[in-house]
């Protein structure tokens, strides 16, 4: 009758000295793994976005949340004049990153998406270029 009580206390004492699993979130930030698929970001090369407006990312996107409009510069090179991602529709699958032939898009480790207005969830090109 006393042995089950002692065994229970043994388990309790063992767990008291273990490292806690839970993080106190606002104070302690988790470090996401390198494979974590967070917010999107456009990569920059020579002070401009690497995107060549090939339309592969909106084509492979299962949620149809990416909008691209192409433009041409003075040297007749294509670039994304308008690039938008609607984060309310995005499922963070990463297909857009895998499909990009010039490696212009990446998934960052940022995961905090809280906003008050729906417009804040539509990420335009300038906002995607800010993310490092």
UniProtKB/Swiss-Prot annotation:
[4Fe-4S] cluster 1 binds at residues 51, 54, 57, 100. Residues 42-71, 81-110 form the 4Fe-4S ferredoxin-type domain. Its EC number is 7.1.1.-. Belongs to the complex I 23 kDa subunit family. NDH-1 is composed of 14 different subunits. Subunits NuoA, H, J, K, L, M, N constitute the membrane sector of the complex. NDH-1 shuttles electrons from NADH, via FMN and iron-sulfur (Fe-S) centers, to quinones in the respiratory chain. The immediate electron acceptor for the enzyme in this species is believed to be ubiquinone. Couples the redox reaction to proton translocation (for every two electrons transferred, four hydrogen ions are translocated across the cytoplasmic membrane), and thus conserves the redox energy in a proton gradient. This is NADH-quinone oxidoreductase subunit I 1.
